[in-house]
Amino acid sequence: MKILVDENMPYARDLFSRLGEVTAVPGRPIPVAQLADADALMVRSVTKVNESLLAGKPIKFVGTATAGTDHVDEAWLKQAGIGFSAAPGCNAIAVVEYVFSSLLMLAERDGFSLHDRTVGIVGVGNVGRRLQARLEALGIKTLLCDPPRVDRGDEGDFRSLDELVQHADILTFHTPLFKDGPYKTLHLADEKLIRSLKPGAILINACRGAVVDNTALLTCLNEGQKLSVVLDVWEGEPELNVELLTKVDIGTPHIAGYTLEGKARGTTQVFEAYSKFIGHEQHVALDTLLPAPEFGRITLHGPLDQPTLKRLVHLVYDVRRDDAPLRKVAGIPGEFDKLRKNYLERREWSSLYVICDDASAASLLCKLGFNAVHHPAR
């Protein structure tokens, strides 16, 4: 049994070798010749999986180690009788922590408290729901927009997108990319929406590049609209609008979900799905794969305020480490993908063991996803 895996899927060689012969290949572009005798293909979001790639090939199963699936033609796979699995929620925590790292940086730079801001979350799935929970744990007001969930009758205080635009100081997008249909998200943030944002608002896109109309956004910024922008995703990736990059406050190369934990979850989820598909079901404990974190434990004295939280968050991950390299190589062919391929190891907040002498600080840090314990000062 021959299994092709994206060369940038961590732990893929070791795990899938339990099931067959493993060959690691680049994801963009996939070497088509390798598909001629392969039984399974494991990809990431950079690989377009459709009829033109797989027609006439012996592939029986496709797995994507990503939460999003807009790069996969699921309808064609089903029609062709090819098994499929994604990894829903695998990188949700990573994306939430990317958003926090960005917001805390902007708050420090511009001198505002997040408690004084209302955050509008567009798309309340694995990422949006976790983001809501962590923001509300800090006492930050959130507004939610998710029309598909409203139509399904899901519980929640959902608002219209117009309401979020009118009332939110921060608008962050966490939707799939739907190019048509009743829940179309292509250019959901169009020129009209962008112009309608509150003066001084923050716009964040960490889902799919085309959810925000990049041309319209650049037009508004060039005209002097007072707006802070965080973009992790771009229309036309791996190409991007270099002029737009110069105008945004934070620009990164589609790495919001790139924690070691998130990548490992993606790999293990598709591994488990494929093992079940071939009748040799196996389960993997994530902590058996992950290395020891860089920082073993730290001690926090006193209560948790925003500056302290910012220092803790940036101790684990400071978004600026990914902004500067992209600006340095933007526009050079191949460099966008190279930044992703050679991405420095990044951990999640749970990797940081925090000993607190303040019980409320320990409790709050646990709600935020840190590994925190309370030890009273002696």
Curated annotation (Swiss-Prot):
Enzyme Commission number, as recorded: 1.1.1.290
Entry GO CC: cytosol
Pfam families: 2-Hacid_dh, 2-Hacid_dh_C, DUF3410
GO-annotated molecular function: 4-phosphoerythronate dehydrogenase activity; NAD binding; protein dimerization activity
The entry's keywords: Cytoplasm, NAD, Oxidoreductase, Pyridoxine biosynthesis
Residues bound to NAD(+): 146, 175, 232, 257
SUPFAM superfamilies the record matches: Formate/glycerate dehydrogenase catalytic domain-like, NAD(P)-binding Rossmann-fold domains
Presence of keyword Metal-binding: no
Binding positions (substrate): 45, 66, 258
Top-level taxon of the source organism: Bacteria
Localisation per UniProt entry: Cytoplasm
Swiss-Prot/TrEMBL catalytic activity: 4-phospho-D-erythronate + NAD(+) = (R)-3-hydroxy-2-oxo-4-phosphooxybutanoate + NADH + H(+)
GO biological process: 'de novo' pyridoxal 5'-phosphate biosynthetic process; pyridoxine biosynthetic process
Active site, per annotation: 208, 237, 254
Associated pathway: Cofactor biosynthesis; pyridoxine 5'-phosphate biosynthesis; pyridoxine 5'-phosphate from D-erythrose 4-phosphate: step 2/5
Function of the protein: Catalyzes the oxidation of erythronate-4-phosphate to 3-hydroxy-2-oxo-4-phosphonooxybutanoate.
HAMAP family named in the record: PdxB (MF_01825)
Subunit architecture: Homodimer.
UniProt protein name: Erythronate-4-phosphate dehydrogenase
Organism in which the protein naturally occurs: Escherichia coli (strain 55989 / EAEC)
